[in-house]
Amino acid sequence: MRAGHETETSIMRPQYPGDDIRPTSKKELAGWYSYGWAAEVFTVCAMGSFLPITLEQMARDRGVLFSDKVTPCSATLNGPSRMSIQARWTLSSRYDAGRPTVANQCVVYIFGVEINTASFAMYTFSVSVFIQAILIISMSGAADHGSHRKLLLMAFAVIGSVSTMLFLGVVPKIYMVGAVIAIIANTCFGASFVLLNSFLPLLVRHHPSVLRSAREPRPALDDSRAQEGHSDTTNGIEHGIESNVTSPLLHARQGNGENAEADMHPATHITVSQELKVSTRISSFGIGIGYIGAIILQIVCILVVIATNQTTYSLRLVLFLIGLWWFIFSIPAALWLRSRPGPPLATTHHGKHTRSWIGYMAYSWKSLYRTAVRTRHLKDILLFLAAWLLLSDGIATVSGTAVLFAKTQLNMQPAALGLINVIAMVAGVLGAFSWGSFSRVFNLSASQTIIACILLFELVPLYGLLGFIPAIKSLGFLGLQQPWEMFPLGIVYGLVMGGLSSYCRSFFGELIPPGNEAAFYALYAITDKGSSIFGPTIVGIITDRYGEIRPAFVFLAILIFLPLPLMLLVDVERGKRDALALAAELQPSGAQTYGTLPTNEDRAPPSEL
């Protein structure tokens, strides 16, 4: 086995000082999977279920009724943190005779401004996403260059997990501290996952099977075999639940010029196909194991909430468990994941390395600017990114809005809200596998499948708007008037998410100029992360204006519909032609030979994040 590793290593030579060319080991892969198992629970169990309702409930415990602005929302001799949430909802229901209206809505005053308790949670998420986007851009240079990647990953993991555990000590009296902790935890989670995904191309490139394929004889492929390999890869992506991968999967060897990917071994159809197969397999398994862990912990959290009588303390306790899970299962990643240092930054004109944090941050923002300038010449990428910005904002906003709507207007208890999330996750996994079969049966292209997902997604807010129609409202059900209606909508939401996660990223990859995957996927990730600033903020403003969340469904319906005409304008073939033309313009006159280190004079300015 050792001899085999030596042979595989011998076909690669370090490209820069500190370059780790050891083949990817099973233990290293286990470390990478372990962090997905550890951290995925935060986005699914915390952000998707218990964190929004915890923030809302703590604010509610300190708020007053919207109807009279005087009566406390929670009044008890035993203290609000231990009073049963079900009991509090029963008390509030006396104002609305069992029918959800604005009467049981609560407001708090922050710096003299009246804010609905549901809006409080939405504003908190908007702030966290804004900080997260700034942080992701600023740290990308340090993550991709030098030896900081693993250090940053573990630092964000520790800060994020410990912050989540600190919710155990946050009582309603200091609910603003809870908002600050939520912002820190969500920011650290997003940053850590971007860092985790940046390991993926390195694990793939040094995977033993990829190294073996690079060493094997490379016969010329005819068109039919090349097409067959491409088809296999596409099917793998369609069926692989490949979501949230925000780093390049092919030859992202950065730092030795704009097209540093060419510095690797000569690109062939065999090598590219093998790398795509390996990357799809690793990515899919990582996402799958993360969801399995999240489902397990979500069920545990539901049982804990029920066993502790569904109090505010119950919500804080499950957040502590989520943070503890995140912390404990990050330890194998810290032990087994190799640092895999990246290439050093380009030198300055004075010959001094810009390795300070200020230098890394400046490099990151300049790289983003260069990528944005390039995008101006690619009409179809611009159209798709605009559609994706709106669509990803809609995805994130609908999730948070639905949870808060179910709690504040349908009076659903935390255990039931957690169960909805489990159902949505299971439906998402099924959707990721079923959309591929659906598209083949109806002979749909990738863009047409995305459009079908958008149309199905549009049904969610439209169904909520049915509650405004007097004839339906008089029935007492339909139009989200009863708690049970949330469960089928959760299935629809999960199916849509499964389809979009399987298709959007792979569709975007078809439009990227070859050799520039790193920069454009970074732009894709920033569009994804940063878009969620606006939706929750607007929903919060609408809720504050009308005193309830239901009117926000009008905004959500518009937000989900807007990507539809943009996707209809995207021309894949035109996008591919434009991408190839731009790649030809960016192709340097000479590429650095694999295995050699360029001098300062020979090194082209880096352009990728």
UniProtKB/Swiss-Prot annotation:
It comes from Aspergillus fumigatus (strain ATCC MYA-4609 / CBS 101355 / FGSC A1100 / Af293). PANTHER family: AUTOPHAGY-RELATED PROTEIN 22 (PTHR23519:SF1). It comes from the Eukaryota. The keyword Manganese does not apply. Vacuolar effluxer which mediate the efflux of amino acids resulting from autophagic degradation. The release of autophagic amino acids allows the maintenance of protein synthesis and viability during nitrogen starvation. The keyword Transmembrane helix applies. The lineage of its organism: Eukaryota, Fungi, Dikarya, Ascomycota, Pezizomycotina. Glycans are attached at N244, N309, N443. This is Autophagy-related protein 22-1.
